[in-house]
A protein has these predicted regions:
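N-terminal Sec-pathway targeting helices
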Residues: 12-22
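A short, structured surface patch at a secondary-structure boundary
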Residues: 77-83, 87-175, 181-188
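N-terminal hydrophobic or amphipathic helices and topogenic motifs
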Residues: 6, 19, 33-112
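Residue-level detector of structured alpha->beta connecting loops
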Residues: 178-179, 202
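Generic detector of N-terminal low-structure segments
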Residues: 21-24, 30
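N-terminal secretory signal peptides that target proteins for export/translocation
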Residues: 1-14
């Protein structure tokens, strides 16, 4: 009996050793896979700056949390904004021109911008934070729909006027006001014909994804 008990104890110890060994190997493999995945993700995130004819890349905006966009800065004050799934926008400084040979899928935004058509309501607070509400002339929300006091005040004073909601903009008013940029929310994707119409009129459309 003692011999049998000893044999059972030896078998149990061996099984325990095998189990621990198996788990150690499994954990090691998981760690290796995790490191490889993280490395691959880092490589994917390290995007190569776009080569723009006539411009020299300088640096990129450092982002701590945002993942939906990136900003690359070039010489002479040019900046390329990339918004995931929405496209790229080249911001051209006042007095400068868009470089020749620019890719057709890059939208040009010419500074200064003083007559923005803001449809994405969530972006208004960002404009307030940078003291930029004065650059918004056209609103996609009526005065009583704004929760931001500065926007209400601007509409009450006439500095900002209602130009129709995202799916029914007042094209004539927007054109008369010399709109240089329309900032839309993702709701515009339900009415792609509106975005196409604005672009046909030469108005850049940027879809905000915050």
């Amino acid at each position: 009996k003692e011999t049998i008990m000893k044999m059972k104890n030896i078998i149990k110890k061996q099984q325990k050793t095998i189990f621990i060994g198996f788990m150690s190997v499994a954990l090691f493999i998981i760690c290796i896979c995790t490191v490889c995945t993280a490395y691959a993700a880092d490589k994917d995130n390290a995007k190569t700056p776009v080569d723009i004819p006539g411009l020299t890349y300088d640096h990129s905006m450092e982002l701590s949390y945002a993942e939906e966009f990136s900003v690359d800065y070039y010489n002479d004050g040019y900046a390329l904004i990339t918004i995931d799934q929405e496209g790229q926008f080249l911001v051209v400084p006042e007095g400068k021109k868009a470089p020749k040979g620019l890719e057709k899928d890059i939208t040009v935004i010419q500074q200064p911008l003083n007559n923005i058509y803001l449809v994405a309501t969530s972006a208004m607070d960002l404009f307030r934070a940078i003291d930029g509400i004065d650059s918004i002339r056209l609103s996609g929300t009526q005065e009583n729909g704004w929760y931001i006091q500065e926007a209400k005040d601007a509409m009450e004073s006439g500095k900002m006027i209602y130009a129709g909601k995202y799916n029914a903009p007042d094209y004539e008013l927007i054109l008369d006001e010399g709109c240089g940029l329309a900032i839309e929310s993702t709701m515009i994707h339900h009415n792609p014909e509106v975005e196409e119409k604005l672009e046909q009129f030469g108005i850049p459309v940027m879809v905000e994804r915050s």
